[in-house]
Amino acid sequence: MFKFALALTLCLAGASLSLAQHNPQWWGNRNTIVHLFEWKWSDIAGECETFLAPRGFAGVQVSPVNENIIAAGRPWWERYQPISYKLTTRSGNEEEFADMVRRCNDVGIRIYVDVLLNHMSGDFDGVAVGTAGTEAEPSKKSFPGVPHTAQDFHPSCEITDWNDRFQVQECELVGLKDLNQHSDYVRSKLIEFLDHLIELGVAGFRVDAAKHMAAEDLEYIYGSLSNLNIEHGFPHNARPFIFQEVIDHGHETVSREEYNQLGAVTEFRFSEEIGRAFRGNNALKWLQSWGTDWGFLNSEQALTFVDNHDNQRDHGSVLNYKSPRQYKMATAFHLAYPYGISRVMSSFAFDDHDTPPPQDAQENIISPEFDEDGACVNGWICEHRWRQIYAMVGFKNAVRDTELSGWWDNGDNQISFCRGNKGFLAVNNNLYDLSQELNTCLPAGEYCDVISGSLIDGACTGKSVTVNEYGYGYIHIGSDDFDGVLALHVNAKV
């Protein structure tokens, strides 16, 4: 009986930890993460204070923080080739990182670090030098900055069969030296690295290439981490939020279901299907059943996004900033529909897969610059600063904890729906106008469309909709309007 009780206690403790690792530890009524891809720490700190907090964002995913290899031309992917766990990159040093985390936490913006637990750098001719000046010989699996030697890695092999679990989890992903996470020593170095970030005040981690590591090894590592730092405003016994990169199209040997109990999982099917729909390759009417009926993970397990830093560079159905009208519609739907843990992308302009972030002649990352409307102008795209996107972050906050109701569609690519009696969204992806009375579910009054403008000094700078005593309002979205979406919520009532 004692053994059974002990086993049950351990089982419940493990379940409690994994459930806690699905909690993003957001402040109050905030619920959207933004990925400030390749931004400097000092710029993120300022963005938290001057833009993200006032606009109601909940957190920032930052690029990898630990020392990486220096690659010719400084492509973005060099950040994903670590050579030590020193906190020095082109985004800044440890002091600047710690300052950014503190300043963001102080205004209610949580920080989530993109971490590389699967591998170290790939092959490099001769001795490689990292962003902190550390030398390494990746071809010999020698990384003195950790230190790691060949005994800390799986034997070298290529992934040629993605249906072979051994190859997927023990061979080298695109030539990156594959760490052996079953080793006590390797585990200890990874836990030490993550715990240091927790000590500095981060709220959690995006785990790169999670499917290339055995779930039981990750479970051990996650379960060994410290609780979040209460000096940064986290409650006692709070666990780091974990979201794991697991690409699973439904026929993978290593599946997302192996990881979704350990933390949230990146729902790539969401990204692909939302892109397909808003590109016009699937009627929007079918989105009424969006979510698990589409084969997606349960809402609390799914990290959702229209695009990410990887798949925005691929061809196919995924939308990115280069199709702005469709991208804004898809993002509005993403943030309005009650499914998933939402993350929006903030990119820099690219012409090819390897384009580096905006940099000066000395290859230093440059700070974003803004025009009079607050949009970025010097190579940074900053989708999160597009009014149509940050306004929907406010919409998502306004409708939190409400259900989907009042669905309407025209049998094709015009849809609308309510979020309780707090918000209303309409979308027109047809080549003809949407013009009719629709149920907004809102209390009677005049509301500003937060897509086309804002509520300023009691007046709308864009469209407005008058809602009658029955909750109906006249909705017009022209086929040639600048935006194909309209959004109303209770915090934008005149």
From Swiss-Prot:
Record-listed E.C. numbers: 3.2.1.1
Pfam families recorded: Alpha-amylase, Alpha-amylase_C
MF terms in GO: alpha-amylase activity; metal ion binding
Residues that bear Pyrrolidone carboxylic acid: Q21
GO cellular component, one term: extracellular region
Gene3D superfamilies in the cross-refs: Glycosidases, Golgi alpha-mannosidase II
Keywords from the named record: Calcium, Carbohydrate metabolism, Chloride, Disulfide bond, Glycosidase, Hydrolase, Metal-binding, Pyrrolidone carboxylic acid, Secreted, Signal
Residue positions binding Ca(2+): N118, Q169, D178, H212
Cofactors that this protein relies on: Ca(2+); chloride
Keyword Disulfide bond: yes
First and last residue of the signal peptide: 1-20
Catalyzed chemical reaction(s): Endohydrolysis of (1->4)-alpha-D-glucosidic linkages in polysaccharides containing three or more (1->4)-alpha-linked D-glucose units
Cofactor info, note text: Binds 1 Ca(2+) ion per subunit.
Compartment(s): Secreted
Top-tier EC class: hydrolase
Marked site (Transition state stabilizer) residue numbers: D310
Active site: D208, E245
Residue numbers binding chloride: R206, N308, R343
GO BP term (any one): carbohydrate metabolic process
Disulphide bridges: C48-C104, C157-C171, C376-C382, C418-C441, C448-C460
Membership in a protein family: Belongs to the glycosyl hydrolase 13 family.
Self-association and partners: Monomer.
Protein name: Alpha-amylase-related protein
Naturally occurring in which organism (per UniProt): Drosophila punjabiensis (Fruit fly)
